């Protein structure tokens, strides 16, 4: 809070812009939300909440939002830059990943092993991601993970990872027919109208 008071002193003489993202912290110290909360309670502070379309285009953003939480209203949308394929085993996964790599896609790993922190800052035109049996949809239509015992949810990691794609996104769904069927339903929403 000492650093906050220094910044506030500066702000008396000139405009100061603060930015925070509690879901994408760089260091453990940033987990402390007291500074952000203190800023939010100050008089004459203007808050702006950014959308999820910071990096991705509208098509990818719409698909990712629908994937994270199934919409109650199915609005027509065409997703020409999204590919979803189903793999029955590891050999098929490898074949699909190699095929997408040949088309210029960069593979991203959804599970943490320390790699995500490095990947989180690297956007790419085309990304391919593996979704395995850990993912499922709950009764309210939210994508969930059976491996979310960590502080930072696997689904939240996946969300940030998917948003690294700038133009095209490919999903390889391994041995998870329920999630694959939902993905196909999202892709075909525009045909239902």
Where are these regions (language model features)?
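Conserved helicase motor core of SF1/SF2 NTP-dependent helicases
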Residues: 1-101, 109-193
